[in-house]
Amino acid sequence: MNRTTLILFFIILSNTITVIHGYVRGCYYTNWAQYRDGEGKFLPGNIPNGLCTHILYAFAKVDELGDSKPFEWNDEDTEWSKGMYSAVTKLRETNPGLKVLLSYGGYNFGSAIFTGIAKSAQKTERFIKSAIAFLRKNNFDGFDLDWEYPVGVAEEHAKLVEAMKTAFVEEAKTSGKQRLLLTAAVSAGKGTIDGSYNVESLGKNFDLLFLMSYDLHGSWEKNVDLHGKLHPTKGEVSGIGIFNTEFAADYWASKGMPKEKIIIGIPMYAQGWTLDNPSETAIGAAASRPSSASKTNPAGGTASYWEICKYLKEGGKETVHQEGVGAYMVKGDQWYGYDNEETIRIKMKWLKEKGYGGAFIWALDFDDFTGKSCGKGPYPLLNAISSELEGESENPEITTEEPSITETEAYETDETEETSETEAYDTDETEETSETEATTYDTDETEGQECPERDGLFPHPTDCHLFIQCANNIAYVMQCPATTFFNDAIKVCDHMTNAPDTCI
């Protein structure tokens, strides 16, 4: 398709019109960012107008029976106030064409409940019916599945997704409404991809695939690296040649996912380390500890982009890595890897050349959303994405025309009540801010390890906090994040509350 030609296809399906638009610009909104103090506090009113084609509201949850539930006390409307669901979906009134999806799950939610649903026909049916009712009740345009990860249950996962798509189509026919969109956030790790996804089946049923091409490196490793880099780099120690955006996207495409459905993930935050030797700063430099606490992550190890801008003003030195396409900043013994405007523009040009469907960000509250930290106006990173992708139509994405919505009141921001469930979730978020790749990596101990099978994830023989990722019979010893262990039954790094007594 010629880049200068705008083609509109009108498909009559279920009494609705489906229109093909340009590149996707997806934006995750996190419902726990409301609890940050001061300049980090983020509410629906902070969401920009016109920069996102899709807003993904993170997160909702589901119980063991399969029933949909809100995560926060103020997600839904009450008799006395409008909730954050309404505040976010209301943005469509001033942004025609915007789609707002509800994202279910997330890293902290885990895999067990989704697995139980997928393995039970009765629970699957209940889950789908509940989800449709919940989405319609709260005026969402679709469902985003953030199941991290369906390792070992790829076929059950695929059948669940197929059943959801079928039900969404049938519901649109009977209701006369536009079909609910069905999307997913998925792993960029080869081992997880191989063990979790029937890609050919998913390619037929997902409307969009949000590739979490970040957190490929982090402070769980003992060497610094760019966690969302585009290409492999010299000096990389773990995931050599495969822990990069290009490999992950191309691998999904090679396994049968249509390129126009693959949406490239761009982090709005940095992964950080404390250098062992501040004079050694190149990729691969030794760093045995996470970076210091930040305002967005008191546990350390990450920092938002707006915090990076402040560190730069305080004397940090930024280097753009041309080979890998990523940036890093060094300030004393603190090392942070991230994307800036320059590297994002390179990534956008790359994805257009490769034929991918667009980009998405994790997350809105990590960009300089106030414009006060970087001195470049609000949302410098998201604006870089939007300016490169807006108006393009090389790889269109299919959505349906806007439904009618009921007039709602403005979101009320003076609520102060907070439940114990919210407090627990917010604490979890400080441990893992990116809601993405559950497995994390350390390849210092690969020597001498053998692969039981050509590809897959396997327990470490002596340490429950490690596991072995095999790719083409090459063994990589990986390390789970702090306070987790490798659960071989579900093939993920799981919370220690589920660990056997022998795992200390």
Curated annotation (Swiss-Prot):
Report residue spans for region: 3 X 14 AA approximate tandem repeats of E-T-E-A-Y-[ED]-T-D-E-T-E-E-T-S: 407-448
Catalysed reactions, as listed in the record? Random endo-hydrolysis of N-acetyl-beta-D-glucosaminide (1->4)-beta-linkages in chitin and chitodextrins
Q: Which CDD domains match?
A: GH18_chitolectin_chitotriosidase (cd02872)
GO BP terms, alphabetized:
chitin catabolic process; polysaccharide catabolic process
* sequence repeats, residue ranges: 407-420, 421-434, 435-448
Q: Where is the composition biased (Low complexity)?
A: 396-408
Question: Do you know which SMART domains this protein is assigned to?
Answer: ChtBD2, Glyco_18
> What spans are recorded as compositionally biased (Acidic residues)?
409-435
Its PTM note reads: O-glycosylated.
Q: What does this protein do?
A: Microfilarial chitinase, which may function to degrade chitin-containing structures in the micro-filaria or in its mosquito vector during parasite development and transmission.
**Mind telling me what this protein is named?**
Endochitinase
